[in-house]
């Protein structure tokens, strides 16, 4: 859309109204780049996003986003192979933290159905390793000691050396007290010195670093600390070198993910902008309009967002209506009405809410053109007329059936008779070309044109003859009338003079009486409409109250169900604990094999309550294709997601299978056949085993962050069994810090698991108390 219309309608000022609700620099940048579009799918997407965010706010009224700074330049530097500084790493750290918080929020969100917003939440990346690396930089811009063993070693040596310097100086302060001007340790040129009286300067061996202005005090670094100070200076240089090395190393770790982090930052900004739109809706009682497919416009109680105490009006621009001509005297708000229509349409096509009532509809226009100028503040002259006509000629050459045209004081600035004729001719040309137009004029000749011409409608701005002031109410279907006689009479002009004047234009008086009757009918209709709206608002409030009550009842129901599930889980936990003890006794007596213990536990775990999501049940979606199994078939063990091969069938119908290094006995329902063309292994949901090659041998990792307690404990148990089946020696369990409930549950589980040799928190630079490293018995 052309930039001129955006400047004319002051669209930038409108966008500025949303800025106070933004929390991120990415959101601010997207707001500033926002412009109207004629693509219906993009507008519909923006409207759907706002509606979903409104629903989200009903359940989570305090939803917020962590404030972030712009990182486009940082990511660009990474792509150019530059190393980042601490401040830049802190910007990235903030973005990753904001992304993690949004992912956790989405994972725990309930009672809200999201489609458009879900796409954005689910596109956010998870970088646990990078987040761990960036913990090396604290918010004060300091590299933590745990960033590397070398840095920690250097800083320990610096600390020890500085302690020695302090001890030596304190001893000298006591021993040489009479030789000092003050009993303190001073600092000169980064060195620790003693303030020695000039008369004793030769009594204390060392390096002179400064002399006072009076010459009475000499600042000497004692010989005893010179060597230590030099060591400290050397260590400081080593520290700086190591910090540069750390910056380079972490830059290399972050570099491959620069594009993904930049994309996450954009998504965070986009969600922030949607959130700001909804906050604006709440603050200004705005609405998300409906979208018309045929350029029909219906604005209910619409008002201009930049006008304080603006009067709300109704505007209906039907599908067949091509022009609305607002007639009547100036100063009544005609130009504001024109701008309100244009600006509302621009806001909607930019994906913004509008200041109107629910039920409002907007069209889609490829272009909006306007010739708007304040004719009352400039001298009427040929140059003014020429300027307007030049603009109109240019517009007439560009408009088409997909355009909206706004013309202010059409035909003004020249002879009234010629100006009125030109105005009618221009409107007729636009009507024949089926171009939607709203025009204002003070020429009375255009009233007749609006009445006599098909698909053209008159309109006016209401004037209160009692107060002699405009009310700024838009009266569609009613042409403007002159109030000169009424105003003159109220201002004290002789009734004789007013009577003589009215007799000279009796025909016009008849027209004015008709217009007056139309105004009365319009006012009566407006009152009835206002009453209907009041009833609608009451119904809307009642509907919201009922929805709120319904949601509260659902939440209470879910709470009770959760309590019941927790109680059931406790019972099952007790049963599993007892089963562990029984199996332990059996193992000690008959030396059962590990896989037999795991099989027994899997059968016991079937007692645990499971949540059934029918919407994701693939059995209900399509029939399961399956043939009879035979020896040599490749299978997938359903309990663990592990592949194996059938080796023989037992007499009781069960099958023996080789799964990795372990032989297992399975019922047919406990495995699925792998199709010949199937290449990818089946992944068990949320139990992500990642094998890595390192000096410690195979490892695995389980991420329990964002999970509920019951779900986390079930996944942990399955994960440990899988690790044992894979003959792994060590695994990592990421549980986060949070409230500590999951962490405590993990600890209790590991304490009672007889296969666990030892466990403990990860190093600080690998997750600290947010992760546990588990070592199994050999």
Curated annotation (Swiss-Prot):
Keyword rRNA-binding appears in the UniProt entry: yes
Annotated Pfam families: MSSS, MutS_V, Smr
Positions of ATP binding: 328-335
GO molecular function terms noted in the UniProt entry: ATP binding; ATP hydrolysis activity; ATP-dependent DNA damage sensor activity; endonuclease activity; mismatched DNA binding; ribosomal large subunit binding; rRNA binding
SMART domains tied to this protein: MUTSac (SM00534), MUTSd (SM00533), SMR (SM00463)
GO biological process, one term: mismatch repair
Domain Smr: 702-777
Chain coiled-coil ranges: none
SUPFAM superfamilies named in the record: DNA repair protein MutS, domain III, P-loop containing nucleoside triphosphate hydrolases, SMR domain-like
Keywords: ATP-binding, DNA-binding, Endonuclease, Hydrolase, Nuclease, Nucleotide-binding, RNA-binding, rRNA-binding
InterPro entries hit by this protein: DNA_mismatch_repair_MutS_C, DNA_mismatch_repair_MutS_core, DNA_mismatch_repair_MutS_sf, MSSS, MutS, MutS2, P-loop_NTPase, Smr_dom
Name of the top EC class for this enzyme: hydrolase
Transmembrane region(s): none
EC number(s) from the headed UniProt entry: 3.1.-.-, 3.6.4.-
PANTHER family given in the database record: OS10G0509000 PROTEIN-RELATED, SMR DOMAIN-CONTAINING PROTEIN
The protein's assembly and partners: Homodimer. Binds to stalled ribosomes, contacting rRNA.
Function: Endonuclease that is involved in the suppression of homologous recombination and thus may have a key role in the control of bacterial genetic diversity.
Family: Belongs to the DNA mismatch repair MutS family. MutS2 subfamily.
Protein name (record): Endonuclease MutS2
Organism: Streptococcus pneumoniae (strain ATCC 700669 / Spain 23F-1)
Gene: mutS2
């Amino acid at each position: 859309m052309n930039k001129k219309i955006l400047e004319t309608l002051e669209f930038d000022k409108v966008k500025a109204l949303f800025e106070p609700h933004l929390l991120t620099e990415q959101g601010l940048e997207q707001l500033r780049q926002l412009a109207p579009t004629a693509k219906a799918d993009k507008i519909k997407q923006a409207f759907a996003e706002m509606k979903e965010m409104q629903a989200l706010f009903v359940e989570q009224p305090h939803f917020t986003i962590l404030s972030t700074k712009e990182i486009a330049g940082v990511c660009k530097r990474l792509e150019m192979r530059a190393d980042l500084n601490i401040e830049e790493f802190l910007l990235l750290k903030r973005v990753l933290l904001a992304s993690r918080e949004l992912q956790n929020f989405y994972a725990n969100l309930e009672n809200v159905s999201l489609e458009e917003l879900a796409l954005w939440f689910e596109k956010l990346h998870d970088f646990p390793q990078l987040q761990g690396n960036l913990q090396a930089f604290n918010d004060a811009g300091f590299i933590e000691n745990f960033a590397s063993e070398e840095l920690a070693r250097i800083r320990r040596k610096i600390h020890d050396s500085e302690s020695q310097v302090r001890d030596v100086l304190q001893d000298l302060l006591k021993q040489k007290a009479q030789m000092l001007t003050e009993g303190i340790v001073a600092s000169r040129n980064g060195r620790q010195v003693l303030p020695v009286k000039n008369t004793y300067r030769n009594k204390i061996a060392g390096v002179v670093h400064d002399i006072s202005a009076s010459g009475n005090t000499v600042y000497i670094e004692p010989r005893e600390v010179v060597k230590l100070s030099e060591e400290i200076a050397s260590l400081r240089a080593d520290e700086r070198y190591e910090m540069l090395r750390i910056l380079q190393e972490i830059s290399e770790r972050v570099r491959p993910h620069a594009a993904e982090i930049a994309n996450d930052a954009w998504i965070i900004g986009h969600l922030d902008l949607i959130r700001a739109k909804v906050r604006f809706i709440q603050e200004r009682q705005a609405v998300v309009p409906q979208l018309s497919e045929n350029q029909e416009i219906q604005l209910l109680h619409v008002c201009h967002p930049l006008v304080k105490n603006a009067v709300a009006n109704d505007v209906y621009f039907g599908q067949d209506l091509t022009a609305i001509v607002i007639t009547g005297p100036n100063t009544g708000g005609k130009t504001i009405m024109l701008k309100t229509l244009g600006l509302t349409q621009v806001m909607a096509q930019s994906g913004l809410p509008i200041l109107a009532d629910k039920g409002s509809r907007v069209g889609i226009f490829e272009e909006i053109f306007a010739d708007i100028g304040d004719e009352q503040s400039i001298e009427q002259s040929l140059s003014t007329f020429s300027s307007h006509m030049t603009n109109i000629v240019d517009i007439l050459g560009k408009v088409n059936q997909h355009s909206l045209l706004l013309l202010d004081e059409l035909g003004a600035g020249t002879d009234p008779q010629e100006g009125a004729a030109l105005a009618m001719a221009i409107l007729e040309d636009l009507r024949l070309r089926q171009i939607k137009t709203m025009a204002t004029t003070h020429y009375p000749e255009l009233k007749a044109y609006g009445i006599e011409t098909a698909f053209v409608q008159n309109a006016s701005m209401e004037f209160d003859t009692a107060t002699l002031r405009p009310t700024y109410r838009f009266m569609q279907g009613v042409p403007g009338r002159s109030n000169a006689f009424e105003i003159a009479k109220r201002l004290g002009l002789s009734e004789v003079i007013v009577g003589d004047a009215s007799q000279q234009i009796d025909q016009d008086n008849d027209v004015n009486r008709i217009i007056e009757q139309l105004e009365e009918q319009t006012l009566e209709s407006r009152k009835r409409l206002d009453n209907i709206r009041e009833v609608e608002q009451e119904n809307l409030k009642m509907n919201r109250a009922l929805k709120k009550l319904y949601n509260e009842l659902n939440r209470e129901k879910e709470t009770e169900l959760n309590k019941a599930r927790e109680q059931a889980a406790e019972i099952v936990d007790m049963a599993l604990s007892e089963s562990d003890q029984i199996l332990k006794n059996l193992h000690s007596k008959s030396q059962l094999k590990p896989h037999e213990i795991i099989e027994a536990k899997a059968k016991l775990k079937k007692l645990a309550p499971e949540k059934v999501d029918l919407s994701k049940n693939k059995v209900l979606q399509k029939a399961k294709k399956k043939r009879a199994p035979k020896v040599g078939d490749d299978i997938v063990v359903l309990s663990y997601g592990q592949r194996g091969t059938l080796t023989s069938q037992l007499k009781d119908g069960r099958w023996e299978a080789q799964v990795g290094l372990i032989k297992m006995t399975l019922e047919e329902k406990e495995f699925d056949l792998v199709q010949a063309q199937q290449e990818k292994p089946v992944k068990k949901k949320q139990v992500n085993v990642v094998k890595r090659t390192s000096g410690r041998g195979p490892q695995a990792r389980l991420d329990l962050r964002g999970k509920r307690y019951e779900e986390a404990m079930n996944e942990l148990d399955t994960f440990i069994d899988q690790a044992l089946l894979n003959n792994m020696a060590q695994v990592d369990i990421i549980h986060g810090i949070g409230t500590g409930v999951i962490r405590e549950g993990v600890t209790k589980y590991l304490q009672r698991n007889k296969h666990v040799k030892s466990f403990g928190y990860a190093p600080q630079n690998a997750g600290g108390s947010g992760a546990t490293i588990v070592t199994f018995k050999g």
